[in-house]
Regions:
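Hydrophobic pocket-lining residues within nucleotide cofactor-binding pockets
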Residues: 294
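Glycosyltransferase specificity loop/lid
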Residues: 1-281, 288-291, 300-302, 306, ...
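Active-site cores of enzymes that catalyze phosphoryl transfer or operate on phosphate-rich substrates
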Residues: 316
């Protein structure tokens, strides 16, 4: 006889939507898969509206239905014993009843009318300062969390899932539980990336890790009298012209892994905030890492990461609701004027040019070639000149579009330019056939599920690793080479022998060749290969490593 006891996990996310969204989806999928789990999500005010909007989306309608269908269904089982009336009623609850979203911020924080990067940075510091108070209240099973009712006051947290960039979390949790004279609970670090990039970031220096190398060089420069900010700015994603081989990927010069980082201004303070995560992730309290990617697509990298870290790596797979995996796409609902423009444009393009005729261009919610905005002009003008209908979304706070280019595109009926686009709806529309992307983890996963051939324009972080996998291992993407902009002008040759000329003429010639390839036989071959890749990740989600690790993650505290 199995005894089912309610359990409770706390999620501590960063305010970056590209990190928070897959972590939110992971959390909801865990609730769906494990009927005994309860979730407390501690968020900042700046991202609360987006979280609430995501929870209300049609993709997650099932979480509000009692006894939901799908993998979260909990049917009566005579071999299961419920120890309390509360547990007996558990099976009749909706998934949303086992979720609480709590805003974690101090009363002293001055809520702004608009969220600037500076205010968000202040919010992050306040969150770190306030987090211990909220964790203590949860661990003590208090009825109120700074005025908000604690729905799960009878269930103390069993484990914590936290964004790996919030390096202070292990020490905070340890301090709270030690003060309460309670035993330490498992901590799981969430990294919204693949195994290859995680290994590249967090491996020891002697094995090829970048953060540990940067930390040593920073410490040496500071010891020799260099200013702290200057040292961090100097070595942030530093490259030295050396060949770097990442498990499962082809060799490249180190600067090729962050191929457009030089176009994105990064304050030294930003790197100062994340580099300690390389040390924190090896804290004894951290018992595992969860990556929302598929182990079967990069077995060598997964093996290397497991060997490097020495603890459990949960390769949980891309995080989508069951309806998305089943290929169900509800009729999209416009939430604003941009959405309405996008949907009308796609419907029009399908009638005019046919199915799979539109290319969607988006570089994510964070990245944009700020120091080389002409790259965007070249791309969009090249598409226009080639008669290739497109949607361009520029969601980054760093992004802006010159007025003359905006006017030029507004006058073109085959162009649609918006600040924000409902990406999941766009990539799954019948008119959409291709995706030009920075190849972040979320965009890559959505392109795979939508079976879209890709064009890659990576900047930094894990985008180079995703691009190498997509373009060179699986050949489902074309990597743009002439747009690459490295930190040092001396670095202009790729490991494969390509010389980056980088002129308007060279860039536009490569772009034209790319558009011709996409719309020719090779483009359809790429689509077929992407379909095969999708089959691999779907099988893993259904009954492979992803399913196995999702099941294990929900019981990691046992």
């Amino acid at each position: 006889m199995t005894v089912i006891k309610p359990s409770h996990f706390v999620v501590v996310p960063t305010a970056m939507w590209g990190h928070l969204r897959p972590l939110l989806h992971l959390s909801l999928n865990l609730l769906t898969l494990h009927p005994n789990l309860h979730l407390t999500l501690l968020v900042t005010p700046s991202v609360l509206p987006r979280v609430e909007h995501e929870l209300k989306s049609t993709s997650f309608a099932h979480i509000y239905t009692k006894s939901p269908s799908g993998s979260g269904t909990s049917t009566p089982n005579p071999n299961v014993h419920h120890t309390t009336a509360q547990e007996q009623a558990q099976e009749d609850k909706a998934i949303a009843d086992r979720l609480q979203v709590i805003t974690c911020i101090s009363p002293e924080f001055d809520m702004p009318k608009e969220w600037s990067p500076e205010v968000i940075a202040q919010e992050g510091m306040d969150y770190a300062k306030t987090l211990p108070k909220f964790l203590q209240a949860l661990a003590s099973k208090e009825h109120k969390l700074d005025g908000t009712e604690n729905k799960f006051e009878d269930i103390a947290p069993n484990f914590v899932v936290y964004d790996s960039f919030l390096h202070f979390v292990p020490e905070v949790v340890r301090g709270v539980l030690t003060g309460l004279q309670k035993p330490m609970i498992p901590l799981i670090a969430f990294i919204p990336s693949n195994a290859a990039a995680t290994w590249h970031t967090f491996a020891k220096e002697e094995n090829g890790g970048t953060f540990t190398l940067a930390q040593r060089l920073i410490d040496e420069d500071i010891a020799n009298g260099m200013d702290v900010l200057e040292a961090h700015g100097k070595h942030a994603f530093g490259t030295y012209g050396k060949v770097k081989t990442i498990p499962g990927l082809p060799p490249k010069f180190d600067y090729e892994w962050w191929p457009n980082f030089a176009t994105v201004p990064m304050p030294p303070q930003a790197f100062m905030g994340i580099i300690p995560s390389a040390k924190a992730i090896r804290d004894p309290a951290v018992s595992g890492i969860v990556c929302p990617t598929t182990a079967e697509t990069e077995p060598l990298a997964v093996e290397a990461l497991e060997k490097e870290m020495g603890f459990r790596i949960y390769m949980a797979g891309p995080q989508f609701p069951d309806a998305a995996w089943a290929g169900e796409h509800p009729e999209p609902q416009a939430q604003n004027a941009d959405d309405a423009n996008v949907f009308a444009f796609l419907d029009k393009m399908k009638k005019k040019h046919g199915a799979k005729s539109v290319i969607y261009v988006s570089l994510g919610s964070l990245f944009f070639p700020v120091t080389r905005p002409e790259l965007i002009r070249y791309i969009l003008q090249s598409l226009k000149e080639s008669g290739f209908p497109f949607i361009f979304a520029y969601a980054s706070q760093m992004a802006s579009l010159p007025e003359d280019l905006q006017k030029e595109l507004n006058d073109d009926e085959d162009s649609c330019v918006v600040k924000f686009a409902p990406q999941w709806d766009v990539v799954n529309h019948e008119a959409t056939g291709y995706f030009l992307s920075h190849c972040g983890s979320n965009s890559t996963a959505e392109a795979m599920l939508a079976e879209l051939p890709m064009v890659s324009m990576p900047f930094a972080a894990d985008q180079g690793e995703f691009t190498a996998m997509l373009s060179e291992v699986y050949k489902v993407s074309i990597d743009l080479k002439q747009v690459k902009t490295f930190k040092s002008p001396d670095f202009n040759k790729l490991y494969d022998g390509t010389v980056v000329v980088g002129t308007e003429e060279a860039i536009k010639a490569e772009l034209k060749q790319t558009w011709d390839t996409l719309r020719g036989p090779e483009g359809e071959a790429m689509r077929a290969r992407m379909r095969d890749l999708k089959a691999v990740i779907k099988k893993s989600w259904a009954d492979g490593r992803s399913k196995k690790d999702m099941l294990a993650l929900g019981t990691c505290f046992e």
